[in-house]
């Protein structure tokens, strides 16, 4: 569990360091609907896909890292979700699993999966993933992510 949170903080530390003035910009590659950002020596990379509103504001995201043989998939979901109700992940109409929340920050709540081969394999073979969450006022939200380019994204993260 320590490794999950270490990677979680590496992800956010890496993202914020990219934004710091005077720092070199990350190397960015696009694999269809996924973006991979790496530091300048390509030793630390993060892949993500973000669902945005019509005005461009982020609603939800999936971040993926691969560090020291661990592939971590992180769902970032809006605040005000019912944390007692796990999210449900469906890939191409096939129920994969339900997952409880791990933590929340000031901007989002997170479900973190470490080396979840069933989830990763289903993403590699699928076309779309739908994450269903429930708000605190019991409204259901279906958030659909494209899986186009996911396998190439994972291959990049794993150095293949």
Residue locations for each model-derived region?
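A generic "folded-domain core" signal
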Residues: 19-160
